Amino acid sequence: MPSDSMTDLPETRANAPEWTVSELSFALRRTVEDAYGHVRVRGEISGYRGPHSSGHAYFSIKDEGARLDAVIWKSAFARLKLRPEEGLEVVAVGKLTTYPGKSGYQIVIESLEFAGAGAIMAMLEERKRRLAAEGLFDAARKQELPFLPKVIGVVTSPTGAVIRDILHRLSDRFPRQVIVWPVRVQGETSAAEVAEAIRGFNALPEGGPIPRPDVLIVARGGGSLEDLLGFSDEAVVRAAAESFIPLVSAVGHETDVTLIDFAADVRAPTPTAAAEMVVPVRADLLAGIDAYGERLSAAPRRLLERRRADFRALARHLPTADALLAVPRQRLDAAGERLPRALRANAAAHRLAFEAVRTRHSASAFRLRLARAQDRVAALGGRLQWGLTGLVSRRSERLSAMTARFGSARAASLRAHVLHLSRCRERLSVLSTRAQRAVRHDLRERTNRLAAMEQLLKALSYRGVLARGFALVRDAQGGAVRAAGAVVPGARLELEFADGRLGVQALGEGAPVEPPQAARPSKGARTKAAQPSLFDD
Protein backbone atom coordinates (compact mmCIF):
# COMPACT_ATOMS: atom_id res chain seq x y z
CA MET A 1 0.00 0.00 0.00
CA PRO A 2 2.64 2.51 0.86
CA SER A 3 4.46 1.70 -2.27
CA ASP A 4 1.37 2.44 -4.31
CA SER A 5 0.89 5.83 -2.63
CA MET A 6 4.42 6.83 -3.23
CA THR A 7 4.02 5.78 -6.80
CA ASP A 8 0.87 7.92 -7.35
CA LEU A 9 2.25 11.14 -5.72
CA PRO A 10 4.31 12.36 -8.63
CA GLU A 11 1.40 11.81 -10.95
CA THR A 12 -0.88 13.93 -8.66
CA ARG A 13 1.62 16.76 -8.56
CA ALA A 14 2.00 16.59 -12.25
CA ASN A 15 -1.77 16.76 -12.81
CA ALA A 16 -2.25 19.86 -10.51
CA PRO A 17 -3.41 22.94 -12.48
CA GLU A 18 -0.95 25.72 -13.09
CA TRP A 19 -1.75 29.22 -11.69
CA THR A 20 -0.26 32.57 -12.38
CA VAL A 21 0.46 34.76 -9.38
CA SER A 22 -2.34 37.14 -10.27
CA GLU A 23 -4.81 34.31 -10.83
CA LEU A 24 -3.97 32.76 -7.49
CA SER A 25 -4.14 36.13 -5.70
CA PHE A 26 -7.54 36.98 -7.13
CA ALA A 27 -8.79 33.45 -6.42
CA LEU A 28 -7.76 33.82 -2.79
CA ARG A 29 -9.44 37.23 -2.70
CA ARG A 30 -12.73 35.79 -3.94
CA THR A 31 -12.46 32.94 -1.46
CA VAL A 32 -11.90 35.31 1.49
CA GLU A 33 -14.62 37.74 0.45
CA ASP A 34 -17.12 34.93 -0.17
CA ALA A 35 -16.29 33.18 3.08
CA TYR A 36 -16.42 36.21 5.40
CA GLY A 37 -18.16 39.07 3.62
CA HIS A 38 -18.95 41.87 6.14
CA VAL A 39 -17.42 41.47 9.59
CA ARG A 40 -17.24 43.36 12.90
CA VAL A 41 -13.73 43.47 14.31
CA ARG A 42 -12.88 44.80 17.77
CA GLY A 43 -9.43 46.15 18.49
CA GLU A 44 -7.19 49.14 19.16
CA ILE A 45 -6.27 51.59 16.41
CA SER A 46 -2.53 51.64 15.81
CA GLY A 47 -0.30 53.55 13.43
CA TYR A 48 -2.91 56.20 12.55
CA ARG A 49 -1.38 59.40 11.19
CA GLY A 50 -4.45 61.02 9.71
CA PRO A 51 -5.82 60.86 6.19
CA HIS A 52 -3.38 60.41 3.29
CA SER A 53 -2.99 63.16 0.68
CA SER A 54 -5.36 61.12 -1.48
CA GLY A 55 -8.04 61.31 1.22
CA HIS A 56 -7.79 57.63 2.17
CA ALA A 57 -6.78 56.52 5.66
CA TYR A 58 -4.40 53.62 6.37
CA PHE A 59 -3.72 52.10 9.80
CA SER A 60 -3.96 48.82 11.75
CA ILE A 61 -6.31 47.27 14.28
CA LYS A 62 -4.58 45.15 16.88
CA ASP A 63 -5.15 43.21 20.05
CA GLU A 64 -2.83 41.22 22.30
CA GLY A 65 -2.23 38.46 19.76
CA ALA A 66 -2.56 39.80 16.21
CA ARG A 67 -2.64 42.82 13.90
CA LEU A 68 -5.02 43.50 11.00
CA ASP A 69 -4.34 46.06 8.30
CA ALA A 70 -7.23 48.47 7.70
CA VAL A 71 -8.12 51.03 5.08
CA ILE A 72 -10.89 53.62 4.89
CA TRP A 73 -11.61 54.97 1.43
CA LYS A 74 -12.10 58.71 1.02
CA SER A 75 -15.83 58.39 0.30
CA ALA A 76 -16.41 56.35 3.48
CA PHE A 77 -14.14 58.55 5.63
CA ALA A 78 -16.39 61.57 5.08
CA ARG A 79 -19.41 59.62 6.35
CA LEU A 80 -17.83 58.35 9.56
CA LYS A 81 -19.61 59.28 12.79
CA LEU A 82 -16.50 58.39 14.77
CA ARG A 83 -13.16 59.53 13.43
CA PRO A 84 -10.18 57.23 14.11
CA GLU A 85 -7.67 58.25 16.74
CA GLU A 86 -4.42 56.62 17.80
CA GLY A 87 -4.96 54.18 20.67
CA LEU A 88 -8.76 54.32 20.46
CA GLU A 89 -10.51 50.97 21.04
CA VAL A 90 -13.20 50.56 18.40
CA VAL A 91 -15.45 48.10 16.65
CA ALA A 92 -14.74 48.31 12.91
CA VAL A 93 -17.50 47.28 10.52
CA GLY A 94 -16.39 46.45 6.99
CA LYS A 95 -15.52 43.96 4.32
CA LEU A 96 -12.59 41.56 4.61
CA THR A 97 -10.47 41.33 1.48
CA THR A 98 -6.92 40.81 0.30
CA TYR A 99 -4.29 43.11 -1.14
CA PRO A 100 -2.51 41.30 -3.95
CA GLY A 101 0.31 43.80 -4.05
CA LYS A 102 1.59 42.62 -0.66
CA SER A 103 0.07 39.16 -0.46
CA GLY A 104 -1.82 40.22 2.68
CA TYR A 105 -5.34 40.57 3.85
CA GLN A 106 -7.06 43.69 5.20
CA ILE A 107 -10.40 45.08 6.20
CA VAL A 108 -12.03 47.87 4.23
CA ILE A 109 -13.81 49.81 6.98
CA GLU A 110 -17.20 51.32 6.32
CA SER A 111 -18.02 52.52 9.86
CA LEU A 112 -16.43 52.80 13.31
CA GLU A 113 -18.03 52.42 16.71
CA PHE A 114 -16.72 52.76 20.21
CA ALA A 115 -15.92 49.46 21.82
CA GLY A 116 -18.17 50.19 24.81
CA ALA A 117 -18.34 53.06 27.30
CA GLY A 118 -14.89 52.23 28.60
CA ALA A 119 -13.34 53.03 25.26
CA ILE A 120 -15.15 56.34 25.12
CA MET A 121 -14.01 57.26 28.62
CA ALA A 122 -10.44 56.31 27.84
CA MET A 123 -10.51 58.46 24.72
CA LEU A 124 -11.98 61.40 26.60
CA GLU A 125 -9.42 61.08 29.40
CA GLU A 126 -6.58 61.07 26.90
CA ARG A 127 -8.03 64.10 25.10
CA LYS A 128 -8.62 65.92 28.38
CA ARG A 129 -5.04 65.27 29.48
CA ARG A 130 -3.63 66.53 26.18
CA LEU A 131 -5.76 69.70 26.08
CA ALA A 132 -5.08 70.44 29.73
CA ALA A 133 -1.35 70.23 29.01
CA GLU A 134 -1.87 73.02 26.46
CA GLY A 135 -3.40 75.24 29.17
CA LEU A 136 -6.91 75.35 27.74
CA PHE A 137 -8.45 74.56 31.12
CA ASP A 138 -6.34 76.98 33.23
CA ALA A 139 -8.23 79.06 35.76
CA ALA A 140 -6.33 82.17 34.61
CA ARG A 141 -8.21 82.01 31.30
CA LYS A 142 -11.62 82.17 32.97
CA GLN A 143 -13.67 85.36 32.58
CA GLU A 144 -16.27 86.76 34.93
CA LEU A 145 -19.85 86.88 33.75
CA PRO A 146 -21.35 90.37 33.28
CA PHE A 147 -23.75 91.40 36.03
CA LEU A 148 -26.58 92.38 33.69
CA PRO A 149 -25.94 91.56 30.01
CA LYS A 150 -27.93 93.40 27.36
CA VAL A 151 -27.69 90.64 24.75
CA ILE A 152 -27.43 86.90 25.42
CA GLY A 153 -26.28 84.48 22.72
CA VAL A 154 -27.55 80.89 22.90
CA VAL A 155 -26.01 78.02 20.91
CA THR A 156 -28.53 75.16 20.86
CA SER A 157 -31.21 73.50 18.79
CA PRO A 158 -34.02 75.94 17.92
CA THR A 159 -36.71 73.26 18.16
CA GLY A 160 -35.87 71.51 21.42
CA ALA A 161 -37.20 72.01 24.91
CA VAL A 162 -33.88 73.53 26.01
CA ILE A 163 -34.38 76.87 24.25
CA ARG A 164 -37.94 77.11 25.57
CA ASP A 165 -36.72 76.51 29.14
CA ILE A 166 -34.00 79.15 28.77
CA LEU A 167 -36.34 81.78 27.29
CA HIS A 168 -38.98 81.07 29.92
CA ARG A 169 -36.48 81.37 32.75
CA LEU A 170 -35.01 84.59 31.38
CA SER A 171 -38.50 86.06 31.01
CA ASP A 172 -39.30 85.22 34.64
CA ARG A 173 -36.07 86.64 36.07
CA PHE A 174 -35.06 89.57 33.87
CA PRO A 175 -36.12 89.79 30.19
CA ARG A 176 -33.13 90.36 27.91
CA GLN A 177 -32.52 90.29 24.18
CA VAL A 178 -31.67 86.72 23.14
CA ILE A 179 -29.99 85.70 19.87
CA VAL A 180 -30.18 81.99 19.06
CA TRP A 181 -27.58 80.40 16.77
CA PRO A 182 -29.30 77.21 15.59
CA VAL A 183 -27.13 74.08 15.57
CA ARG A 184 -27.52 70.33 15.61
CA VAL A 185 -26.76 69.10 19.12
CA GLN A 186 -26.31 65.48 18.03
CA GLY A 187 -24.98 63.76 14.96
CA GLU A 188 -22.05 63.88 12.60
CA THR A 189 -22.03 67.67 12.05
CA SER A 190 -22.90 68.64 15.62
CA ALA A 191 -19.35 69.42 16.78
CA ALA A 192 -18.48 71.47 13.69
CA GLU A 193 -21.70 73.50 13.93
CA VAL A 194 -21.25 74.23 17.65
CA ALA A 195 -17.62 75.33 17.15
CA GLU A 196 -18.63 77.50 14.19
CA ALA A 197 -21.45 79.09 16.22
CA ILE A 198 -19.09 80.03 19.07
CA ARG A 199 -16.58 81.55 16.65
CA GLY A 200 -19.40 83.27 14.73
CA PHE A 201 -20.69 85.04 17.83
CA ASN A 202 -17.15 86.20 18.66
CA ALA A 203 -16.68 87.50 15.11
CA LEU A 204 -19.70 89.83 15.31
CA PRO A 205 -18.50 93.46 15.33
CA GLU A 206 -19.57 95.77 18.11
CA GLY A 207 -22.20 98.23 16.91
CA GLY A 208 -23.04 96.12 13.86
CA PRO A 209 -26.50 95.29 12.50
CA ILE A 210 -26.53 92.14 14.65
CA PRO A 211 -25.64 93.06 18.23
CA ARG A 212 -22.70 91.24 19.73
CA PRO A 213 -23.73 89.16 22.79
CA ASP A 214 -22.35 90.01 26.21
CA VAL A 215 -22.47 86.35 27.30
CA LEU A 216 -22.89 82.99 25.55
CA ILE A 217 -24.79 79.87 26.62
CA VAL A 218 -23.95 76.54 24.95
CA ALA A 219 -26.82 74.27 25.94
CA ARG A 220 -28.19 70.80 25.30
CA GLY A 221 -30.51 68.48 27.15
CA GLY A 222 -29.51 65.19 28.72
CA GLY A 223 -28.51 62.12 26.73
CA SER A 224 -26.22 59.13 26.58
CA LEU A 225 -22.46 59.37 26.55
CA GLU A 226 -22.46 58.92 22.78
CA ASP A 227 -25.13 61.62 22.34
CA LEU A 228 -23.06 64.17 24.26
CA LEU A 229 -19.80 63.23 22.58
CA GLY A 230 -19.95 66.15 20.15
CA PHE A 231 -19.49 68.63 23.03
CA SER A 232 -16.22 66.90 23.93
CA ASP A 233 -14.87 67.34 20.41
CA GLU A 234 -11.50 69.05 20.25
CA ALA A 235 -12.77 71.75 17.87
CA VAL A 236 -15.60 72.65 20.28
CA VAL A 237 -13.24 72.74 23.27
CA ARG A 238 -10.76 74.99 21.48
CA ALA A 239 -13.50 77.36 20.29
CA ALA A 240 -14.84 77.65 23.85
CA ALA A 241 -11.36 78.31 25.27
CA GLU A 242 -10.62 80.97 22.63
CA SER A 243 -13.93 82.80 23.09
CA PHE A 244 -13.57 86.47 24.02
CA ILE A 245 -17.18 86.50 25.16
CA PRO A 246 -17.80 84.89 28.58
CA LEU A 247 -19.22 81.42 27.95
CA VAL A 248 -21.50 79.24 30.09
CA SER A 249 -21.58 75.50 29.42
CA ALA A 250 -24.96 73.86 30.07
CA VAL A 251 -24.77 70.42 28.45
CA GLY A 252 -26.86 67.56 29.81
CA HIS A 253 -27.77 67.06 33.44
CA GLU A 254 -25.71 67.72 36.54
CA THR A 255 -24.12 64.26 36.38
CA ASP A 256 -23.16 64.59 32.71
CA VAL A 257 -19.60 65.82 32.11
CA THR A 258 -18.20 66.97 28.76
CA LEU A 259 -14.87 68.57 27.91
CA ILE A 260 -16.51 71.89 27.04
CA ASP A 261 -17.35 72.18 30.75
CA PHE A 262 -13.63 72.49 31.53
CA ALA A 263 -12.95 75.07 28.80
CA ALA A 264 -16.02 77.22 29.53
CA ASP A 265 -15.79 80.16 31.94
CA VAL A 266 -18.69 78.80 34.02
CA ARG A 267 -20.36 75.38 34.05
CA ALA A 268 -24.08 75.20 34.72
CA PRO A 269 -25.63 71.90 35.82
CA THR A 270 -28.66 72.43 33.53
CA PRO A 271 -29.74 74.89 30.80
CA THR A 272 -32.27 76.39 33.22
CA ALA A 273 -29.52 76.98 35.76
CA ALA A 274 -27.46 78.68 33.03
CA ALA A 275 -30.29 81.17 32.47
CA GLU A 276 -30.33 81.85 36.21
CA MET A 277 -26.58 82.43 36.24
CA VAL A 278 -26.45 85.02 33.45
CA VAL A 279 -29.20 87.38 34.74
CA PRO A 280 -30.31 88.40 38.23
CA VAL A 281 -33.90 88.49 39.43
CA ARG A 282 -35.42 91.80 38.40
CA ALA A 283 -37.74 91.88 41.41
CA ASP A 284 -34.79 91.33 43.75
CA LEU A 285 -32.90 94.18 42.09
CA LEU A 286 -35.87 96.52 42.43
CA ALA A 287 -36.29 95.52 46.06
CA GLY A 288 -32.60 96.10 46.64
CA ILE A 289 -32.79 99.50 44.98
CA ASP A 290 -35.77 100.42 47.16
CA ALA A 291 -33.88 99.25 50.24
CA TYR A 292 -30.84 101.29 49.24
CA GLY A 293 -33.09 104.29 48.59
CA GLU A 294 -34.65 103.99 52.02
CA ARG A 295 -31.25 103.67 53.62
CA LEU A 296 -30.00 106.63 51.61
CA SER A 297 -32.93 108.81 52.66
CA ALA A 298 -32.77 107.60 56.27
CA ALA A 299 -29.05 108.25 56.60
CA PRO A 300 -29.35 112.09 56.60
CA ARG A 301 -32.17 111.90 59.12
CA ARG A 302 -30.13 109.68 61.42
CA LEU A 303 -27.15 111.97 61.03
CA LEU A 304 -29.30 115.00 61.85
CA GLU A 305 -30.72 113.27 64.93
CA ARG A 306 -27.23 112.39 66.13
CA ARG A 307 -26.09 115.97 65.61
CA ARG A 308 -29.10 117.25 67.54
CA ALA A 309 -28.43 114.82 70.38
CA ASP A 310 -24.78 115.87 70.47
CA PHE A 311 -25.83 119.52 70.49
CA ARG A 312 -28.26 118.97 73.36
CA ALA A 313 -25.59 117.10 75.31
CA LEU A 314 -23.13 119.92 74.79
CA ALA A 315 -25.77 122.50 75.69
CA ARG A 316 -26.42 120.74 79.01
CA HIS A 317 -22.77 121.10 79.95
CA LEU A 318 -22.64 124.82 79.09
CA PRO A 319 -23.00 127.30 82.04
CA THR A 320 -26.10 129.53 82.23
CA ALA A 321 -26.12 133.23 81.43
CA ASP A 322 -26.50 134.21 85.10
CA ALA A 323 -23.50 132.07 86.00
CA LEU A 324 -21.44 133.62 83.25
CA LEU A 325 -22.40 137.20 84.22
CA ALA A 326 -22.19 136.85 87.98
CA VAL A 327 -18.49 137.69 88.32
CA PRO A 328 -18.56 140.53 85.75
CA ARG A 329 -21.55 142.01 87.57
CA GLN A 330 -19.67 141.98 90.87
CA ARG A 331 -16.68 143.62 89.21
CA LEU A 332 -18.97 146.25 87.71
CA ASP A 333 -20.55 147.01 91.07
CA ALA A 334 -17.14 147.33 92.72
CA ALA A 335 -15.93 149.60 89.93
CA GLY A 336 -19.08 151.70 90.31
CA GLU A 337 -18.33 152.18 93.99
CA ARG A 338 -14.69 153.18 93.30
CA LEU A 339 -15.53 155.52 90.42
CA PRO A 340 -16.69 158.62 92.46
CA ARG A 341 -13.60 158.49 94.64
CA ALA A 342 -11.37 158.10 91.63
CA LEU A 343 -13.05 161.02 89.89
CA ARG A 344 -12.58 163.29 92.90
CA ALA A 345 -8.95 162.28 93.26
CA ASN A 346 -8.34 162.85 89.57
CA ALA A 347 -9.95 166.30 89.71
CA ALA A 348 -7.80 167.28 92.71
CA ALA A 349 -4.65 166.14 90.94
CA HIS A 350 -5.54 168.14 87.86
CA ARG A 351 -6.19 171.25 89.97
CA LEU A 352 -2.76 170.95 91.59
CA ALA A 353 -1.13 170.56 88.21
CA PHE A 354 -3.00 173.59 86.90
CA GLU A 355 -1.88 175.70 89.84
CA ALA A 356 1.72 174.68 89.25
CA VAL A 357 1.48 175.62 85.60
CA ARG A 358 -0.19 178.92 86.39
CA THR A 359 2.53 179.70 88.91
CA ARG A 360 5.23 179.00 86.35
CA HIS A 361 3.55 181.27 83.81
CA SER A 362 3.06 184.34 86.04
CA ALA A 363 4.48 187.82 85.03
CA SER A 364 7.33 187.83 87.52
CA ALA A 365 8.36 184.35 86.52
CA PHE A 366 8.19 185.35 82.89
CA ARG A 367 10.41 188.42 83.46
CA LEU A 368 12.90 186.30 85.34
CA ARG A 369 13.11 183.80 82.54
CA LEU A 370 13.45 186.65 80.00
CA ALA A 371 16.38 188.16 81.89
CA ARG A 372 18.10 184.82 82.07
CA ALA A 373 17.55 184.34 78.36
CA GLN A 374 19.04 187.77 77.61
CA ASP A 375 22.11 186.94 79.64
CA ARG A 376 22.56 183.70 77.76
CA VAL A 377 22.16 185.52 74.42
CA ALA A 378 24.79 188.11 75.40
CA ALA A 379 27.20 185.40 76.44
CA LEU A 380 26.61 183.52 73.25
CA GLY A 381 27.13 186.74 71.22
CA GLY A 382 30.52 187.31 72.81
CA ARG A 383 31.60 183.75 72.20
CA LEU A 384 30.38 184.00 68.62
CA GLN A 385 32.34 187.20 67.99
CA TRP A 386 35.52 185.70 69.34
CA GLY A 387 35.01 182.57 67.31
CA LEU A 388 34.31 184.45 64.09
CA THR A 389 37.41 186.56 64.53
CA GLY A 390 39.61 183.49 64.98
CA LEU A 391 37.95 181.71 62.07
CA VAL A 392 38.49 184.67 59.73
CA SER A 393 42.12 184.84 60.70
CA ARG A 394 42.70 181.12 60.12
CA ARG A 395 40.86 181.18 56.82
CA SER A 396 42.90 184.20 55.64
CA GLU A 397 46.14 182.35 56.34
CA ARG A 398 44.93 179.25 54.50
CA LEU A 399 43.78 181.41 51.58
CA SER A 400 47.17 183.06 51.27
CA ALA A 401 48.91 179.66 51.23
CA MET A 402 46.49 178.27 48.69
CA THR A 403 46.90 181.38 46.51
CA ALA A 404 50.63 180.82 46.40
CA ARG A 405 50.24 177.14 45.49
CA PHE A 406 47.52 177.86 42.99
CA GLY A 407 49.58 180.34 41.05
CA SER A 408 52.10 177.79 39.82
CA ALA A 409 49.50 175.08 39.28
CA ARG A 410 47.27 177.48 37.39
CA ALA A 411 50.03 178.38 34.96
CA ALA A 412 50.77 174.72 34.18
CA SER A 413 47.09 173.91 33.83
CA LEU A 414 46.57 176.87 31.56
CA ARG A 415 49.36 175.73 29.25
CA ALA A 416 47.91 172.23 29.12
CA HIS A 417 44.46 173.58 28.33
CA VAL A 418 45.82 175.78 25.57
CA LEU A 419 47.59 172.80 24.00
CA HIS A 420 44.44 170.65 24.28
CA LEU A 421 42.31 173.40 22.73
CA SER A 422 44.71 173.69 19.82
CA ARG A 423 44.49 169.96 19.12
CA CYS A 424 40.71 170.00 19.40
CA ARG A 425 40.52 172.90 16.98
CA GLU A 426 42.56 170.94 14.42
CA ARG A 427 40.38 167.80 14.82
CA LEU A 428 37.25 169.94 14.59
CA SER A 429 38.47 171.46 11.33
CA VAL A 430 39.12 168.00 9.84
CA LEU A 431 35.72 166.66 10.98
CA SER A 432 33.96 169.77 9.65
CA THR A 433 35.53 169.28 6.24
CA ARG A 434 34.49 165.61 6.15
CA ALA A 435 30.97 166.44 7.30
CA GLN A 436 30.55 169.10 4.61
CA ARG A 437 31.68 166.65 1.90
CA ALA A 438 29.32 163.93 3.22
CA VAL A 439 26.38 166.35 3.41
CA ARG A 440 26.98 167.60 -0.12
CA HIS A 441 27.27 164.00 -1.42
CA ASP A 442 24.09 162.91 0.36
CA LEU A 443 22.27 166.02 -0.85
CA ARG A 444 23.24 165.28 -4.46
CA GLU A 445 22.04 161.66 -4.17
CA ARG A 446 18.74 162.71 -2.60
CA THR A 447 18.28 165.39 -5.30
CA ASN A 448 18.87 162.82 -8.06
CA ARG A 449 16.45 160.30 -6.47
CA LEU A 450 13.85 163.05 -6.03
CA ALA A 451 14.16 164.06 -9.68
CA ALA A 452 13.82 160.41 -10.80
CA MET A 453 10.77 159.90 -8.61
CA GLU A 454 9.29 163.15 -9.92
CA GLN A 455 9.72 161.93 -13.50
CA LEU A 456 8.17 158.54 -12.58
CA LEU A 457 5.27 160.27 -10.84
CA LYS A 458 4.63 162.46 -13.85
CA ALA A 459 4.73 159.41 -16.13
CA LEU A 460 2.28 157.45 -13.98
CA SER A 461 -0.05 160.32 -13.04
CA TYR A 462 -3.34 160.61 -14.86
CA ARG A 463 -2.66 164.37 -15.21
CA GLY A 464 -0.13 163.56 -17.90
CA VAL A 465 -2.97 161.91 -19.83
CA LEU A 466 -5.15 164.99 -19.27
CA ALA A 467 -2.38 167.19 -20.63
CA ARG A 468 -2.58 165.24 -23.90
CA GLY A 469 -6.21 166.34 -24.41
CA PHE A 470 -8.18 163.71 -22.51
CA ALA A 471 -10.72 164.29 -19.74
CA LEU A 472 -11.57 162.36 -16.52
CA VAL A 473 -15.29 161.73 -15.89
CA ARG A 474 -16.52 161.60 -12.29
CA ASP A 475 -20.00 160.94 -10.90
CA ALA A 476 -21.82 163.05 -8.33
CA GLN A 477 -20.00 161.29 -5.47
CA GLY A 478 -16.56 161.97 -6.98
CA GLY A 479 -15.92 158.42 -8.17
CA ALA A 480 -14.38 157.77 -11.56
CA VAL A 481 -16.79 156.63 -14.32
CA ARG A 482 -15.14 153.81 -16.28
CA ALA A 483 -17.95 152.73 -18.65
CA ALA A 484 -20.85 154.40 -20.47
CA GLY A 485 -23.24 151.78 -19.12
CA ALA A 486 -22.56 153.04 -15.62
CA VAL A 487 -24.19 156.42 -16.40
CA VAL A 488 -27.95 156.87 -16.48
CA PRO A 489 -29.57 159.67 -18.47
CA GLY A 490 -29.94 162.82 -16.42
CA ALA A 491 -27.04 161.98 -14.11
CA ARG A 492 -24.83 164.87 -13.07
CA LEU A 493 -21.20 164.42 -13.95
CA GLU A 494 -17.96 166.31 -13.61
CA LEU A 495 -15.32 166.55 -16.34
CA GLU A 496 -11.75 167.17 -15.25
CA PHE A 497 -9.41 168.69 -17.87
CA ALA A 498 -5.80 169.58 -17.57
CA ASP A 499 -6.66 173.23 -16.87
CA GLY A 500 -9.79 172.82 -14.70
CA ARG A 501 -13.09 171.07 -14.02
CA LEU A 502 -16.51 171.41 -15.64
CA GLY A 503 -19.96 170.22 -14.41
CA VAL A 504 -22.20 168.49 -17.02
CA GLN A 505 -25.40 166.41 -17.20
CA ALA A 506 -25.76 163.13 -19.16
CA LEU A 507 -28.43 163.34 -21.91
CA GLY A 508 -28.31 159.69 -23.02
CA GLU A 509 -26.78 157.73 -25.90
CA GLY A 510 -25.91 159.35 -29.26
CA ALA A 511 -24.16 162.49 -30.47
CA PRO A 512 -24.28 165.56 -28.29
CA VAL A 513 -27.14 168.01 -28.97
CA GLU A 514 -26.16 171.37 -30.35
CA PRO A 515 -27.07 174.09 -27.89
CA PRO A 516 -29.49 176.75 -29.20
CA GLN A 517 -28.03 180.04 -30.34
CA ALA A 518 -28.55 182.57 -27.64
CA ALA A 519 -30.12 185.89 -28.66
CA ARG A 520 -27.61 188.68 -28.84
CA PRO A 521 -28.36 191.23 -26.13
CA SER A 522 -29.26 194.76 -27.09
CA LYS A 523 -26.68 197.40 -26.94
CA GLY A 524 -28.63 199.32 -24.41
CA ALA A 525 -28.75 196.51 -21.88
CA ARG A 526 -26.76 197.49 -18.81
CA THR A 527 -26.79 194.09 -17.12
CA LYS A 528 -26.36 190.56 -18.40
CA ALA A 529 -28.57 187.66 -17.37
CA ALA A 530 -26.87 185.20 -15.07
CA GLN A 531 -25.84 181.96 -16.79
CA PRO A 532 -27.75 178.96 -15.29
CA SER A 533 -25.65 176.16 -13.71
CA LEU A 534 -25.89 172.61 -14.93
CA PHE A 535 -26.41 171.49 -11.36
CA ASP A 536 -29.38 173.83 -10.68
CA ASP A 537 -32.80 172.20 -10.28
UniProtKB/Swiss-Prot annotation:
GO biological process: DNA catabolic process
E.C. number(s) listed in UniProt: 3.1.11.6
Keywords noted in UniProt: Cytoplasm, Exonuclease, Hydrolase, Nuclease
Single GO MF annotation: exodeoxyribonuclease VII activity
Superkingdom in the source lineage: Bacteria
Cited InterPro entries: Exonuc_VII_L (IPR003753), Exonuc_VII_lsu_C (IPR020579), OB-fold_nuc-bd_dom (IPR025824)
Transmembrane segments: none
Stretches the record annotates as Disordered: 508-537
GO terms under cellular component: cytoplasm; exodeoxyribonuclease VII complex
Reaction equation(s) it catalyzes: Exonucleolytic cleavage in either 5'- to 3'- or 3'- to 5'-direction to yield nucleoside 5'-phosphates
Compartments where found: Cytoplasm
Pfam families: Exonuc_VII_L, tRNA_anti_2
EC category name: hydrolase
UniProt subunit comment: Heterooligomer composed of large and small subunits.
Similarity comment: family membership: Belongs to the XseA family.
NCBIfam families (UniProt xref): xseA
Its job: Bidirectionally degrades single-stranded DNA into large acid-insoluble oligonucleotides, which are then degraded further into small acid-soluble oligonucleotides.
Name of the molecule in the record: Exodeoxyribonuclease 7 large subunit
Annotated organism of origin: Azorhizobium caulinodans (strain ATCC 43989 / DSM 5975 / JCM 20966 / LMG 6465 / NBRC 14845 / NCIMB 13405 / ORS 571)
Name of encoding gene: xseA
